[in-house]
């Protein structure tokens, strides 16, 4: 059956042919995978003067905005991969229904700078049980869970025209030799919807209008002790919704 979208429907559809997977390990909003270290971080630097008002990374509005941008595909089963120093490997998953492929060194690793090769033991690619369809003109940007700083693997970033191609088989760069055990539910990759558009761009010196726009923008933030940037965002959203 061919999936179709109504012209006014702005929906992303994820599906699987694996019975029960949507209940056991579903694709989720990326905001459900905010890393623990960020959650535990204080907004203010501890043991500083109360009036110093020195904030930490948690006060940076770009961080929570980034965490909410898309969707996360969690690993759907336990996985064990053993990579020997001579390049031999074997893998085992907790369910024989889940299959894995390998990108040989000649496909990726051997083309990297030396320092990057040192951090690449093997590239593993799952036969991902999830498929996705986006509205016309919308691609998905595949990203690693950057701020999770996973010591075992990193998924390679890239873009997929998911309005016409619905497979998402992630390329996992394993960092370590020996046995790597990755548990079911580990966030595998983040997917951010991006609209395919072409933009013109200009590089020039500042104009009076540029300076005025910057001063207005800066004052919206500087005129508040806290949440000036966030309040500017809310005002912009309200204006957008009224148009």
Regions found by a protein language model. Give the residues of each.
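Non-catalytic terminal segments and appended small domains
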Residues: 1-165, 171-243
């Amino acid at each position: 059956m061919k999936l179709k979208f109504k012209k006014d429907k702005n929906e992303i559809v994820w599906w699987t042919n694996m019975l029960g997977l949507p209940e056991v390990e579903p694709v989720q909003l990326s905001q459900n995978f905010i890393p623990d270290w960020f959650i535990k971080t204080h907004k203010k630097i501890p043991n500083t003067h109360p009036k110093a008002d020195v904030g930490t990374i948690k006060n940076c509005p770009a961080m929570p905005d980034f965490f909410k941008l898309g969707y996360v595909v969690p690993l759907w089963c336990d996985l064990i991969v053993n990579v020997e120093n001579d390049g031999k490997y074997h893998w085992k998953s907790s369910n024989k229904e889940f299959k894995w492929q390998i990108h040989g060194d000649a496909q990726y690793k051997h083309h990297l700078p030396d320092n990057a090769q040192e951090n690449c033991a093997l590239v593993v690619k799952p036969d991902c049980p999830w498929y996705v369809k986006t509205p016309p003109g919308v691609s998905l940007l595949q990203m690693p869970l950057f701020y999770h700083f996973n010591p075992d693997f990193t998924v390679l970033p890239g873009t997929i025209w998911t309005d016409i191609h619905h497979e998402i088989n992630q390329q996992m760069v394993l960092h370590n030799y020996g046995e790597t055990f990755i548990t079911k539910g580990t966030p595998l990759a983040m997917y951010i919807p991006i609209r395919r558009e072409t933009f013109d761009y200009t590089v020039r010196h500042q104009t009076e209008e540029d300076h005025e726009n910057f001063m207005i923008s800066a004052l919206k933030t500087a005129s508040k002790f806290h949440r000036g940037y966030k309040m500017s965002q809310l005002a912009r959203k309200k204006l957008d919704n009224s148009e």
